[in-house]
C-alpha cells in the first residue's frame, strides 16, 4: 500500500515540510454511489424514452480476442460504464471503447471478464457446471459470482427502439384492485412462485451492492408511492418449487392472508423437470394454476390475479424444455376468467435474447435473473397496474403530521444528536427531501456506529391517533459506517406507556417505514414521538455523520 502527496502548479523547490495520515482502515461498501432514488430510476420503463439506465452485460473473450458485448439498443452516446455493484466507474479509451456498436475492452482494462475456456467444460462437475444439451457443461455459480463480474451501461438511443411486447393497463380486468388503488384504500398483494419470484441471485438476495430490492418489492413500493395506498406485500414464494406444490400449498400460503391481488409466478422448475425432457406438460401446468386461483377464491371470491409467464433458462443447458409453452395456457385462463390478467415475460425475455446473451442477464447462468432482468419483471407488472393518467393527491386515509415545510416544527435533539435543522438539500443521495422543499436533518458526533441516535418531538397538545392503523415516516442517512447494515426505531409515548417498533433500512435512500399501531391501546393520547437511527454490526467509532427524516404521519383504518 502506498499513500502519496504533492503540491501542484509549481516545480520550484519546497523546503522540508511534512504531511500526515491517520486511521487507515477498510470500509464495507454500502452503496454510497446509489444514484438518486435507486428504485425510481430502476423502474423507468425500458420501452419508453431515449436513455437506457444501467443495462447489464458480462464481457466475454472468444478464442483469445478482446472481450466484448452487445447492447440491447444501438447506442448514440455512452453516459457511464460501471460495475454492477455500482462501486466502480470505468473510463472510455482507458477501460473500454465502442466498436461497431459493441462495447469492447482495451488491452489493459480494469473491467472483469470471462473467457470461453472459463465458461465451457468438457465434463460435468457438481456444484460448478450444468450439463449442456449436446454434451459438455457450462459454468454455473450461485451467490454473487456473476453479479461481481457484470458491468452496467447507461446510454442514449433512438426513440421507439424496443420491438417486443409492452404491458397494457389492466384496469378493465382488475377492477377491484384499481378501485382500491385509485381511492387510496389499503391493498394486500401476495406474490406466489418459485425462486425467481423469491428474488434469488438478485443483489439484495446475495447481500451485494447495490442491494436492489426484489422485483415484487419494487412493484409494491412503486404502486404505493404512485397511488398513496398502504400496500401490504407478502412474498410467499419458495425456491425450487413448481406449480403442483403451489396448488397444494395455496390455502395456507395465499388464501389465509385474504389477498386482494395475487401475482402467480411459477413455470421455470415446471418446465425443466429433472432435466431429461420430463418437464410438466402445458395442460397439467394450466390445471395447477387454475387450482391456485380456485383455492384462493373459495375463501375470497373477489381476489384478483396477475399470472406471470416465466423467463427462459439457459438454452445451452438441459434446463430448457417446456417453459416456452406455458404462457399460452396462462393467457387462456385470463381470457376466460374475470379478474385475471397475464404478463408475458416469456416473450419479453425471448426478445431480449435476440440482442443480448443469456449471461448478460443472469445471476447464476442457468435460470435466475440478475438485477437488470428483475427490473423487466417489475416494470412490466407495474405497467399493467400503474395508471399514469391518474394524478394522485394525498389519499383520504393519509394524515401527514410533520412535513418540515415551515421549519423543525418542534423537533429537537435526543440522545447522541448534536443538532437538528430543516434543510432543502442533503450531501448524501438522493440530495434532497423525500417530499416538498424541506426535510429534517440530524447531525451526530463521533461515537460507536451501533449507538442509537435520536430526534424527538413533544406535541403542543397530545395527538389523538384513535383512528390510526399505521404510523409512517421516511428516513435516510449517510453511508460509510463500516457496519453490516442500518436500523431505525420509532417510539410513541402516551405518558408512561410506550409503543416501539424497529425496522431495517439502507443508507443513501429514502426508506418508507410503516409501524402497525392499530391495536395499541394508548394511541388516543400520544405525548411524545422519538425516531432513532443506528448502524449494525460495528461498534467502532463512526466519525460525525447525519441522518434525515421527512413526511411523518399516519394512515387511518
Predicted regions and their residues:
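Extracellular carbohydrate recognition and processing domains
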Residues: 1, 493-527, 538-540
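Extracellular carbohydrate-recognition regions
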Residues: 27-41, 52, 391-420
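Extended beta-strand solenoid/passenger and fiber regions
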Residues: 30-164
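Serine-esterase "nucleophile elbow" of acetyl-processing enzymes
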Residues: 161-236, 249-258
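Active-site segments of SGNH/GDSL-like serine hydrolases
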Residues: 265-269, 294-326
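Catalytic His-Asp segment of secreted/periplasmic serine-dependent ester chemistry enzymes
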Residues: 310-392
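Short carbohydrate-recognition loop motifs
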Residues: 427-451
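Extracellular/lumenal carbohydrate-interaction signature centered on repeated Trp-anchored short motifs
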Residues: 449-471, 481-483, 504-507, 521-525, ...
Amino acid at each position: 500500500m502506498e499513500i502519496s502527496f504533492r503540491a501542484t502548479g509549481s516545480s520550484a523547490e519546497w523546503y522540508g515540510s511534512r504531511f500526515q495520515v491517520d486511521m487507515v482502515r477498510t470500509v464495507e461498501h454500502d452503496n454510497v454511489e446509489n444514484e438518486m432514488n435507486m428504485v425510481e430510476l430502476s423502474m423507468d420503463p425500458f420501452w419508453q424514452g431515449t436513455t437506457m439506465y444501467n443495462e447489464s452485460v458480462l464481457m466475454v473473450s472468444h478464442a483469445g480476442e478482446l472481450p466484448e458485448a452487445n447492447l440491447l439498443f444501438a447506442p448514440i452516446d455512452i453516459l457511464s460504464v460501471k460495475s454492477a455493484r455500482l462501486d466502480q466507474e470505468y473510463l472510455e479509451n482507458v477501460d473500454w471503447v465502442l466498436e461497431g456498436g459493441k462495447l469492447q475492452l482495451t488491452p489493459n482494462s480494469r473491467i472483469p471478464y470471462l473467457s470461453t475456456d472459463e465458461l465451457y467444460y468438457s465434463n460435468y462437475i457438481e456444484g460448478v457446471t450444468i450439463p449442456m444439451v449436446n454434451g459438455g457443461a457450462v459454468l454455473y455459480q450461485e451467490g454473487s459470482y456473476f453479479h461481481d463480474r457484470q458491468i452496467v451501461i447507461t446510454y442514449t438511443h433512438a426513440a421507439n427502439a424496443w420491438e417486443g411486447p409492452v404491458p397494457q393497463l389492466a384496469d378493465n380486468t382488475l377492477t377491484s384492485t384499481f378501485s382500491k388503488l385509485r381511492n387510496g384504500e389499503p391493498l394486500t398483494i401476495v406474490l406466489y412462485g418459485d425462486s425467481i419470484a423469491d428474488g434469488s441471485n438478485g443483489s439484495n438476495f446475495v447481500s451485494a451492492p447495490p442491494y436492489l430490492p426484489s422485483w415484487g418489492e419494487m412493484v409494491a413500493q412503486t404502486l404505493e408511492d404512485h397511488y398513496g395506498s398502504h400496500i401490504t406485500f407478502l412474498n410467499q414464494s419458495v425456491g425450487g418449487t413448481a406449480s403442483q406444490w403451489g396448488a397444494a400449498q395455496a390455502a395456507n400460503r395465499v388464501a389465509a392472508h385474504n389477498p386482494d391481488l395475487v401475482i402467480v409466478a411459477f413455470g421455470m422448475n415446471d418446465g425443466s423437470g429433472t432435466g431429461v425432457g420430463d418437464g410438466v406438460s402445458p395442460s397439467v401446468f394450466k390445471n395447477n394454476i387454475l387450482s391456485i386461483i380456485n383455492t384462493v377464491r373459495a375463501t375470497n371470491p373477489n381476489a384478483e390475479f396477475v399470472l406471470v409467464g416465466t423467463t427462459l433458462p439457459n438454452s445451452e443447458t438441459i434446463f430448457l424444455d417446456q417453459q416456452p409453452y406455458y404462457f399460452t395456457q396462462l393467457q387462456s385462463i385470463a381470457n376466460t376468467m374475470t379478474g385475471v390478467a397475464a404478463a408475458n415475460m416469456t416473450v419479453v425475455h425471448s426478445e431480449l435474447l435476440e440482442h443480448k446473451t443469456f449471461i448478460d442477464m443472469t445471476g447464476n447462468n442457468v435460470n435466475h435473473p440478475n438485477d437488470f432482468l428483475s427490473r423487466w419483471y417489475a416494470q412490466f407488472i407495474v405497467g399493467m397496474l400503474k395508471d399514469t393518467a391518474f394524478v394522485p393527491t394525498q389519499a383520504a386515509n393519509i394524515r401527514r403530521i410533520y412535513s418540515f415545510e415551515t421549519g423543525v416544527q418542534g423537533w429537537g435533539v435526543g440522545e447522541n444528536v448534536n443538532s437538528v435543522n430543516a434543510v432543502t438539500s442533503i450531501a448524501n443521495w438522493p440530495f434532497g427531501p423525500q417530499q416538498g422543499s424541506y426535510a429534517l436533518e440530524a447531525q451526530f458526533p463521533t461515537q460507536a456506529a451501533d449507538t442509537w441516535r435520536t430526534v424527538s418531538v413533544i406535541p403542543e397538545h397530545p395527538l389523538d391517533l384513535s383512528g390510526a392503523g399505521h404510523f409512517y415516516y421516511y428516513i435516510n442517512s449517510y453511508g460509510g459506517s463500516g457496519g453490516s447494515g442500518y436500523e431505525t426505531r420509532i417510539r410513541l409515548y402516551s405518558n408512561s406507556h410506550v409503543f416501539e417498533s424497529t425496522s431495517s433500512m439502507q443508507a443513501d435512500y429514502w426508506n418508507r417505514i410503516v409501524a402497525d399501531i392499530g391495536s395499541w391501546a394508548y394511541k388516543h393520547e400520544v405525548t411524545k414521538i422519538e425516531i432513532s437511527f443506528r448502524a449494525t454490526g460495528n461498534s467502532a467509532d463512526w466519525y460525525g455523520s447525519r441522518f434525515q427524516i421527512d413526511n411523518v404521519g399516519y394512515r387511518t383504518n
